[in-house]
């Protein structure tokens, strides 16, 4: 009932490792299995993980990661220099729904952007001044994720790509000037 690491997880890790600085205070939103956070631990000042799933939260704790069970980063008052998120970015069709926590980990809502919008709307609250975020998105998302980023006054740069059979995944670095 936890999202298992896949190509998108690897893409986030690669982009995070290129961006990471030793003095970064990092939050990984929706950390799931802890694949990324586990590999960043010890390479930065601190790392906090969040996940909405109690099963993911238990797994993150089991791996020795600091975790807050919450939706995105609700209730967290600290701001972070590096924010990471591999969101659910696909629209899960009704016949594929299982009615469990894995649905929450995979289903990005209509056109795959519901959770991405929620994340972008909360980014000012969790990203420090001169902070950066790395977001994973799909070429299948509508409206275009780049437009959603622009509409919220952020700047962005594609810092990684991965072509799959039916879509292209992007690692997008986001910041404010």
UniProtKB/Swiss-Prot annotation:
GO terms for cellular component: eRF1 methyltransferase complex. Its EC number is 2.1.1.-. It is an enzyme of class 2 (transferase). Coiled coil: none annotated. It catalyses: L-glutaminyl-[protein] + S-adenosyl-L-methionine = N(5)-methyl-L-glutaminyl-[protein] + S-adenosyl-L-homocysteine + H(+). One of its GO terms (biological process) is methylation. Substrate binds at residues 86-89. InterPro entries: DNA_methylase_N6_adenine_CS, Euk-Arch_PrmC-MTase, PrmC-related, SAM-dependent_MTases_sf. SUPFAM superfamilies: S-adenosyl-L-methionine-dependent methyltransferases (SSF53335). S-adenosyl-L-methionine binds at residues 30-34, 51, 86. Keywords: Methyltransferase, S-adenosyl-L-methionine, Transferase. GO terms for molecular function: nucleic acid binding; protein methyltransferase activity; S-adenosylmethionine-dependent methyltransferase activity. Belongs to the eukaryotic/archaeal PrmC-related family. Putative protein methyltransferase using S-adenosyl-L-methionine as the methyl donor. May methylate a Gln residue in target proteins. PANTHER family: METHYLTRANSFERASE N6AMT1 (PTHR45875:SF1). This is Putative protein N5-glutamine methyltransferase AF_1784.
């Amino acid at each position: 009932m936890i999202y298992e690491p896949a190509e998108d997880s690897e893409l986030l890790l690669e982009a995070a490792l290129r961006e990471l600085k030793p003095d970064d205070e990092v939050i990984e939103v929706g950390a799931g299995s802890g694949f990324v956070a586990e590999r960043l631990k010890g390479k930065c000042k601190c790392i906090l993980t969040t996940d909405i799933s109690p099963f993911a939260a238990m797994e993150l704790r089991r791996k020795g990661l600091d975790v807050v069970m919450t939706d995105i980063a609700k209730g967290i008052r600290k701001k972070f220099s590096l924010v990471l998120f591999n969101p659910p970015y696909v629209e899960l069709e009704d016949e594929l729904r299982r009615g469990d926590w894995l649905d929450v980990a995979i289903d990005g809502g209509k056109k795959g952007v519901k959770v991405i919008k929620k994340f972008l709307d909360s980014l000012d609250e969790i990203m420090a001044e001169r902070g950066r975020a790395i977001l994973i998105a799909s070429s299948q998302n509508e409206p275009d994720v780049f437009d959603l980023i622009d509409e919220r006054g952020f700047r962005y740069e594609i810092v990684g790509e991965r072509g799959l059979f039916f879509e292209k995944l992007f690692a997008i670095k986001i910041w404010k000037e």
